[in-house]
A protein has these predicted regions:
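SF2 helicase/translocase ATPase core recognition
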Residues: 1, 124-180
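Conserved Helicase C-terminal RecA-like lobe
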Residues: 2-122, 127-133
Length: 180
């Protein structure tokens, strides 16, 4: 059991570290209590990382073309959504976060109200749109981080490409760091 806990902690660290190379917890041996790994902070919350720059580049171009963008972030224990929200709002881009705290039955209404109020970008966990939402208003989907569940990924990537979609194309971007 100890090996599984250590492996799980390593896997979580290795998956999230490229996106948030700061403020990561130490990996502690579950029996001895000794520190196994103390992740080095390679940046901080204020540092704009290369993946964030790429996301901003895509969003700027899409907003300039009059399109709306949905950004998916899978890791809920990080501050990625809050950081992306700040970066986009600093650019004057009207951005909202569709949080998991909004119950599924109210998400469509929540989204409709935000779009009517002029939201250009929505940031959410792909599980929030896994079922029941048509996202035809969004012609660009950016997977900033991806989880392990391919069903969720496929469902989220198809939310904008529905039978009643009138846009000539829907673009899906999956951002990642090379050699990771």
């Amino acid at each position: 059991k100890a090996a599984n806990k250590i492996l799980s902690a390593y896997l979580n660290l290795l998956t999230v570290y490229p996106d948030q190379p700061y403020d990561q917890p130490e990996i502690i041996h579950p029996i001895s209590g000794c520190t196994i790994v103390k992740p080095e902070d390679m940046a901080d919350f204020q540092t704009v990382l290369p993946k964030e720059e790429k996301m901003l580049e895509i969003v700027r171009a899409k907003i300039a073309a009059g399109e709306r963008v949905m950004i998916y972030t899978s890791w809920t224990r990080t501050d990625t959504q809050r950081k992306l929200l700040g970066l986009l709002r600093e650019e004057g881009i009207r951005t909202e976060i569709l949080s998991t705290q909004i119950v599924p039955e109210k998400r469509e209404d929540w989204l409709s109200k935000r779009l009517s109020a002029g939201a250009q970008v929505i940031i959410t966990n792909p599980k929030c749109v896994e079922t029941g939402l048509d996202l035809n208003a969004f012609t660009t989907l950016i997977f900033y981080s991806m989880g392990y569940n391919l069903f969720t990924l496929r469902q989220a990537s198809r939310r904008s490409w529905r039978i009643n979609q009138t846009a000539p194309r829907v673009e899906v971007y999956m951002l990642y760091y090379a050699d990771t």
